[in-house]
Amino acid sequence: MIAKKIIGFIGITRLDKPIGIYLLLWPALIALFISTEASIYYSFLIIVIVGSILVRSTGCVINDIFDMEFDKKVERTKDRPLASGQLSKQEAYFIFLLLSLSCLFLVSDLERQPQLVCLFFAFLIVFYPLTKRFLKIPQVFLGVTFGASIPIVFSMNGKLFDTSMWVLYLANFCWIIAYDSFYAMSDYDDCLLYTSPSPRDRY
């Protein structure tokens, strides 16, 4: 039973699929390198690395909670811990709460501005799964949300409104839309069964 729950925890947080962490971490490390002019504070580096893992996992959990019924009907997602019954919804909420509190603790010693930026993007992360219900192109909202690490890192170094931040954020925004649109195509046949029109059709 315990082993089953551990496997479920790993599955719902996607720790067994670290590519999502890399996609969040790489832009954050670039932002850290630019905003500090290569004079990186090790405390900030730890926050960026640990934060990328926690935030990605938190986003995956809340996404699975909101999409549980849809996931049951999609070939690619039907075996996810919530959709398959490996974890209960109450257990998923507990994991989400635990990860959220860990994120809060991680940024508790930061200045006021980066804390507010973190709070703003936290709301977007929670809201993102719901956008797939009413936005024709939710990839755009994901592009805004998943690039959170860039303004957060720049604000940590007091450079939130630096031009280089906006350039990097925009480039990352386009990159996210590109790879997530390609990713969404894998569910195209299932989307035709349960939604109309599909996001890909809008492109």
Predicted regions and their residues:
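Transit-peptide-like, low-complexity N-terminal presequences
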Residues: 1-7
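Intramembrane alpha-helical segments
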Residues: 7-11, 50, 80-163, 167
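Membrane interfacial helix-start motif at the N-side
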Residues: 7-19, 196
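The first (N-terminal) embedded transmembrane alpha-helix
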Residues: 16-31
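Alpha-helical phosphate/pyrophosphate-handling elements in metalloenzyme active cores
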Residues: 28-44, 154-158
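Membrane-embedded alpha-helical segments that form the functional core of polytopic membrane enzymes
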Residues: 38-66, 100-103, 115-124, 161-182
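Single conserved hydrophobic/aromatic residue that forms the stacking wall/gate
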Residues: 194-203
